[in-house]
Structure formats: C-alpha cells, structure tokens
Amino acid sequence: MRTYILFITLLCTLSLKAQIVDCTPSKPTGDDEVTVTFDLTKCSFQKASLVDFEGPIYSHMGVITSESPSGTEWKSRIALWPDKTTPDKCNIDAVKLQKVGDNLWQLKITPSVKEFFMQNTQMEPPYEFKADEQLLSIEFVLRNADGTMDGRATGDKKSNIKLLLSHTIAPGEDSPRPEGVQRGINYHNDESLTLVLFAPGKQFAYLMSELSNWEVKEDYRMKRDGDYFWITLNHLIPGKEYAFYYLVDGLLDIADPYANKILERKFDKGISPVAYPNLMEFPEKCKADIVSVWQTAKPEYPWEVTDFKGVRQDRLTIYELLLRDFTRNGEYKGNLKLALEKLDYLKSLGINAIELMPFCKIDGITNWGYHSTFFFATEKVYGTEEDYKKFIDECHKRGIAVIMDIVLDHAYGTCSLVRLYADPPGNTKAQPAADNPWFNMVSPNTKYSWGADFNHESKETQILLDSICAFWLKEYKLDGFRFDFSKGFTNTPGDGSAYDPDRIRIIKRLSDEIRKRKSDAYLIYEHLAGDQEEKELAEHDLMLWGKQNSPFSNAINGVQKGSSFKGAMASSKGWSKNNRVTYMESHDEERVAYNASVNGIGEIRTELEAVSYTHLRAHETVLD
C-alpha cells in the first residue's frame, strides 16, 4: 500500500495568503493540531473595525464536511454569536485568540480539528461526526466580546482553511490503453468512449463526474499505462452532455486539455442565451471551477461546401475581424449569428479572406482572445460549435477563406497543461514547474512575454501544436492560420530581435507538418523580426505580417515625410516570393481615419469625410 495525501478542492471564500498569514502545518488534515495566525489589516468589516483593537478577540467558527448538503453548510460550529445567546456560550477560552504582534492574532486548534469541534461545540445536541465523514474546511469570523466589531474576508465572506484528508491509496491497475486511442476523448460508439490523460510523473487519477456523484470512487479510478491514465466508459446516454474533470494525485482538478467544450463556474453566467442557447448549466455538486464536456452521438454538422479552394496566397485581401466588437450594438456582445448577417457586406468590400481574431477558449470572456487556455475548444461567448462551422461554411459559399488567428507562444494559468505542472501545483497564478512537459519555467524573452511560455524545443510541445493545428483544419475546415507573436517561438534568450536560426528551424518544422495535412494552407506569421530571418521564412513560402501603419497614416494626414509605400512591397525586402501581408491597420494599430481626425493637416482634419474617402480608396489600390 502507498499512502498519499488527498486534497479535496473547495469553493474557497478566501485564499490562505489573503487573511491567514500563517498556518501550521501549512497543509493540515482533520487529524492535526493546527495553529492559525490572522492579520487584522487584511480583513474587511461589516461592523466596527478590529484593526488596532487590543482585545479580547474571539472566533465564531464552523466546519464543512462531506455531509454538508450544499458544500457550504457548517455541520459543527463553536461559539455562537453574542446577540443570539448568553456570553458564557460564545466567549469561551477555546476560541479566544492570543495577540502575537501588531494586528496579528493567533488561535490554536487542539488536540486535532475533529476533537476540537467535538469538545467545544455549543450545538444542542452536539453534532457527532460519522465514521467515514470527511472534514473539508474550517471557516472563521473574528469578533469582539459583544459582536459589535468583526473581521472577515474581503467581500464580507468568512475566512477559510482547506483541509487535507489522509487516505491510503492502493496501487492502481496497470493496463495498456486500448489500441488506437489518442490523448483526450475517444468516442467508440453512441454509448461508449475512452478518456486518456497524458500526465508523466503523476501517481494516480480519478474521473470525477455525475457518474461518481462528483465523489472519489474506486470504480472511476483511471488505469495507468506508463505516462498515461485512461478509463473506458460504457452504457452512456446517447446525445447527453456529461461534465467531468480529472482529480490527479488527490490534489489537482484538471479539465481535459483536449476537450472541445469547457464549462466555467465563474464566466458561463455572463454568456448571452442569444449567442449560446440552452448552454449546459455548471454542475452544482462539482467541486472544481472548470470542467470539460463529452457527448456521444453528437450530430455532425452538414457541410454545404466540402471542397473550398481559396485564392492564390499572393492575391489575398484579408479582413481582420473581432467577433466581440464587430456586431456589438454598443456593447461587447458581438456573436457569430450577427456576424453572419454581415457577410454579404464584407464580400462587397472586395475581400476574399477573413482573419478571425482568436476564438479558442480564453481566460475570461471579454478580451481580444490572446489569453488562450484550452486550444481544442471554441469560445462559447460568441456561439456554439455549430455556429462557428456555419460561419465558415457561409464564408466558403461566398468565396471567402477563413484564417484562424491563434496564439501558440503562451497560455494562461487556467490552462490544464499549465496547472498540472505548476509551482505550486494547481495555482492559476504560479509559474510552470521544472518538470512541465510543455512550458518553460520562465520565458527566455527579456522584453515580451505573457502567461506561461511554451517550450518550443520540447518534443511534447511540438506534438501538442501539431495536434492543435490538425484539429482545426479537419474539424472546422479552416483555410489557414495567422500565428501571433511568432518571434516567441524560441528558447533563445533576449528580446527576440536578433537573427535566430533555432527559431527559423522551429517555424519551418511546424509549417511543414501543417502542410502535410493541408498543402495549400495559408500560413501567416506575425514575426516582425529582422530582414534576414524574414527573408528565409518568406523563401520557405511562408507569409509575414508587414506593418505599414505609419506610412499610410502619414499619407492620409498630409505628411510627406515617412509616407513612402515602398516597404509594403516584398521586393523592397529582397524577397523572390510575394509573401508580405501588408496592412495599414490591425488590432494593435490606430485607425488611420481616426488618426487623421486628430493629427491631419488643415482641411484633412476639418473635411475628414470627403478626404478620407479619396485617400482610403487610393490606399485600397496600393494594397490590392
């Protein structure tokens, strides 16, 4: 037998570091003696403040257990509130804190958490813990003797300590994976599937779902096959959506990183039912905050265009589109259904490609999309998976290619691949740990970095990125990608501006793998590096973003200096192939017409509408 500590994840009202500045031991169990130190300066107060109060201070406290129906109900409590009982039943020595420093007060819970509540409760009759009942969390509210002053967590919530539960975990079954299964969800038929989690170095994993009533059950312990954990499920209800996550080493609640649909407790409530009708509700009993979804017998989208062929890449006229703002009607509520109504308008502009700003699942729901977390799932705030496919299908019917803007240089902390190997584990704000198979501990870029930095030299990262690109090309019939900040596709230290042969090798490898699957895929890199490096990539038939915002802005503003369009041409760079994607505006640049309204000379500023039409039509000719 191997003994592990099983950590039950709760909906915490306060992180340990926010108000409780010290807890000994740092990861207590219900069988431990625990000493807790509170910092009054980090409390909020419903009544009078306890800051600088000299005492006495007492704790009103309770314990949440596995028997708490809602996951928040106190099953046993100590020290009733003074306005509800006589002082002798609330101001007891067991919950009286000791001052140990300026605004620092300490409480000792002894001889153990369970014994402490059994010996000191004022509940009538006293609550008796069941033999198999698990203590999950202790909650506190600090107060003075008569309850006219109190201290609690920010937002008028109680402070909270998570408890670890000691369990003896038997060795799991070692068994080879079924033949042909891949990482993620593998559907066999309308009632059966196999889940596969790649987690090298981890000891055990459980499937958590409604099938187990969101509890740890041996029937849902995953089998182990080397670096993989897997489980096959049968007798599922065809067409039904099941939410699930993996509990890894009793500590980490991980949504499947390969899932096509993600639910979030915090953000799903902000998704409009107009954009996403009948969205599955977040499961009430689930202890994790992010879960994945499987669905057998899912209806196939009936593609109308199955053989779309876009224009030659040197004939692309691209419209960059942020779904959030494109049809927002005064609010950040743009969606795919509204964007569909504008396709004929976009076609009338003369475009033949739309570059959709990132629509992989992001951290939150209202940013530009560059905070990617789940790379195989769509962002639900814009619509359903079927809505995305219909948008692409309708674009193809109009001769418009769809290019996916995608972020493959970093991911954010709620990404399962980050959390699975974070330091400390599971922390969404922590940096990747040294054993993370996909991410660098620290970005090698000394100037530009966001979130967790992908280690592009890692074989596992390369496998992952190849899978991501292959998925979107096949499942959504996308026509190509625009790779954000490809300057970050390297482990070479520095700001990314120097010539980097390793980066060239990495980008060529990724591009070649994509073209094995789709030979005519549009591959655009936001590289913005030196001429030598960009020329090598262009000669590999890759397209490079060519920023020309300043020349076009100067031209429309009536400023002669710096208004040459020479840099828009690939030939000006010495390229033999016309692979420069020149743009006068992008999401990172100011709109040239607005710039002219502020900085234009003379009548350009005062007669903007007439002048803008003339100048912008001229710019359109240059870019065509």
Across the structure, where does each feature detected by a protein language model lie?
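Bacterial Sec-dependent N-terminal signal peptides
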Residues: M1-V21
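Short amphipathic, basic-aromatic surface patches that mediate peripheral association
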Residues: L40-S49
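Aromatic-rich carbohydrate-binding modules that target alpha-glucans
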Residues: V51, P56-D132, G147-G155, H188-N189, ...
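Short beta-strand elements
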Residues: R152-A170
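Basic K/R-rich, polyanion-interacting modules in nucleoproteins and related proteins
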Residues: T168-A205, N260-D314
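Active-site-proximal helices and loops of the catalytic beta/alpha 8
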Residues: G226, C360, W368-H371, F485-Y583
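Substrate-binding/active-site clefts of carbohydrate-active enzymes
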Residues: K261-G270, P299-E300, E304-L316, L322-K477, ...
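Single conserved hydrophobic/aromatic residue that forms the stacking wall/gate
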Residues: H615-D624
